[in-house]
Amino acid sequence: QLFECSDGIRVIGDEMHDVENAVNAIEYLLKMTERGETLNEQTVRYVIGMVGAGSAGLLHSLDGDCVCITSRGKPIKAKTVGQKNYLDSIASNTVTIAVGPAGTGKTFLAVAMAVNALRAKQVNRIILTRPAVEAGERLGFLPGDLQSKIDPYLRPLYDALFEMLGMEGYTRNVEKGAIEIAPLAYMRGRTLDDSFIILDEAQNTTPE
């Protein structure tokens, strides 16, 4: 049980272990707010779950530097231990393969790492690509010209770049060739030196 007091929060429980877990979870959540992070139900549940599983120490690995600053000044950081491991893998390996449910930040964090590498001049350009269709679909059955057909499939990549760079920054980098977004089918025979390459939705690729 939690009780609000004049000097803080009092935690009362039958088991000392449970009380300690509750205190650890509350202290970490307070630390997150002090860093300016926004709390939501998903974040609170994650912290409680990690503490309850005896992994409270791993939460402190998330306190590191941000990956990237968005065009609106928002810092992008790992919010879970899985995301932290993902970012560490990208930073230390030539190729990283990420598998996970939709909405877990795979594309967004990869784009953040790419933008950070471009800003730091570690790479000369960012190439983002994905299969132009979902598994079992054909472009020929979709209305419009080729660009209008493939744009909906590339929208998650556009959204992530707009968040990181803003519309003006995105347009400027595209015009000078520093950012390229294209269907995977257009990548055959390309020279990809000094590039940060992200292949999104790779599970929809075919042997061809």
Where are these regions (language model features)?
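Interdomain "pre-motor" coupling segment immediately N-terminal to P-loop NTPase/helicase cores
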Residues: 3-63
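Pre-Walker A adenine-sensing motif
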Residues: 75-91
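Walker A (P-loop) ATP-phosphate-binding motif of ABC ATPase nucleotide-binding domains
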Residues: 95
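Hydrophobic anchor at the beta1->P-loop junction of P-loop NTPases
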Residues: 98-100
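Conserved glycine(s) of the Walker
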Residues: 105
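Conserved P-loop
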Residues: 108-178
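Walker B catalytic acidic pair
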Residues: 194, 201
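Conserved D-loop-proximal element of ABC-family nucleotide-binding domains
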Residues: 206-207
